């Protein structure tokens, strides 16, 4: 007598390792504008949120000693006017890279063809631009992530100068929404 026996079976096993945690970072950027300045140094002493609907920045006329004047700004060839200083702060836990673009112009936008803008970031001069050339006045600026209670920030100064070659066709014109 012959006896044959077989067993047919599938064996499975699982091995796994748990990943502790995957968590995304938080990007938290604030944009503020200067509202008050030290009368001796001219440095900003107070800031307001620039992202609020009622926050509209206006160019500021300064005298020869860089003192701010409250008069209306009427552009004329050769004159330079400044925006209030802007402060970009990184309150998040991710590093940040940003640029500042001049855009949104409405009205007689050809007026921007004869205004050259320039900027500085923390005192370092950036490239001067004309809006018709693309409008990115500040590019590739980096801010580290917030560490403890200290939020890294940059102070940006932007000015515009009307070209001395601007002719009569630019008189009594308005551009808004920049």
Regions found by a protein language model. Give the residues of each.
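Long, small/polar-residue-biased beta-strand-and-loop interaction regions
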Residues: 1-178
